[in-house]
Amino acid sequence: MKQYIFFLALIVLVSTFAEAGKKTEILDKVKKVFSKGIAGVADLNNMSELGCPFIEKWCEDHCESKKQVGKCENFDCSCVKLGGK
């Protein structure tokens, strides 16, 4: 009976270490995905610097129709009302 308890405890101990190893693998995968996400945001920011001149004209026209002034930042068109009543 003591042998069964010993082997059961040994199996539990080994499975605990095996699970601990899997957690580090999962953590590495999460870190890898997170770093890819950060790289994607950096790429998008770099593209916005190139794409903004094309979008700038559209933004100016769009805001001009609202009688406002437009500015493009990171593919985001912001309309600002000048002067005001």
Curated annotation (Swiss-Prot):
Keywords: Disulfide bond, Ion channel impairing toxin, Neurotoxin, Potassium channel impairing toxin, Secreted, Signal, Toxin, Voltage-gated potassium channel impairing toxin. Disulfide bonds join 52-72, 59-77, 63-79. Residues 1-20 form the signal peptide. PROSITE patterns: BSPN_CSAB. One of its GO terms (molecular function) is toxin activity. It is found in: Secreted. It comes from the Eukaryota. Residues 49-85 form the BetaSPN-type CS-alpha/beta domain. Residues 21-37 form a propeptide. GO terms for cellular component: extracellular region. Expressed by the venom gland. Belongs to the long chain scorpion toxin family. Class 2 subfamily. This is Neurotoxin beta-KTx 17. It comes from Lychas mucronatus.
